[in-house]
Amino acid sequence: MAKKKKKVDENNQVLATNRKARHDYQILDTWEAGVVLLGTEIKSLREGKASLVDAFAVIDNGEVWLHNLHIPTYSMGSWTNHSPKRTRKLLLHRREIDSLMGKVRDGNRTLVPLKLYLVNGRVKLELGLAQGKQDYDKRQDIKRRTEEREVTRELGRRIKGINA
């Protein structure tokens, strides 16, 4: 009897990640926020087309807004299609917004989207409180990662040498 293929859960999947944010910023804390979207935006996201590269969040009048999230127009859409880089509202609890306002106002910090994903059919955004890294910090991180990689590689070689 043939094996059954595992069904991909379309209601719980990662739609886009912002890998550059973890490289350019030190992430101090994260929050999960809902995103207010139009119907054609949801359909376009389900096609796997989104970019968080230049996106950032701003707190304005006690509301959190996401700028520069690029969701291309829906391929099967008509005149009802959305604008690809429109400003989108993020849904957070009032005390979370107040906490964010205090932390961003302290200075030298910004709100950066890290991941866009589906939870039970609803689009959620992982929002990070970020502080910019200097060039030497980035170089130190790269050096540390390469050293860790070399150590694990050497351990693997030694284990294979003993067991083989």
Swiss-Prot record:
Indicate where this protein is primarily found: cytoplasm
Q: GO: which molecular function terms?
A: RNA binding
What InterPro entries does its record include?
SmpB, SsrA-bd_prot, SsrA-bd_prot_CS
An annotated GO cellular component of this protein is: cytosol
PROSITE patterns on file: SSRP
Q: Does the keyword Cell division apply?
A: no
Which interval of the chain is the signal sequence? none
GO biological process, any: trans-translation
Q: Which UniProt keywords apply?
A: Cytoplasm, RNA-binding
Query: Has the keyword RNA-binding been applied to this entry?
Result: yes
Taxonomic superkingdom: Bacteria
Q: Where in the cell is it found?
A: Cytoplasm
Q: Which Pfam families match?
A: SmpB
Family assignment from sequence similarity:
Belongs to the SmpB family.
Q: What does this protein do?
A: Required for rescue of stalled ribosomes mediated by trans-translation. Binds to transfer-messenger RNA (tmRNA), required for stable association of tmRNA with ribosomes. tmRNA and SmpB together mimic tRNA shape, replacing the anticodon stem-loop with SmpB. tmRNA is encoded by the ssrA gene; the 2 termini fold to resemble tRNA(Ala) and it encodes a 'tag peptide', a short internal open reading frame. During trans-translation Ala-aminoacylated tmRNA acts like a tRNA, entering the A-site of stalled ribosomes, displacing the stalled mRNA.
HAMAP family referenced in this protein's UniProt entry, alphabetically: SmpB (MF_00023)
Protein name, per record: SsrA-binding protein
Origin organism of this chain?
A: Corynebacterium efficiens (strain DSM 44549 / YS-314 / AJ 12310 / JCM 11189 / NBRC 100395)
| Highest classification ranks of the organism | Bacteria, Bacillati, Actinomycetota, Actinomycetes, Mycobacteriales
Which gene specifies this protein's sequence?
A: smpB
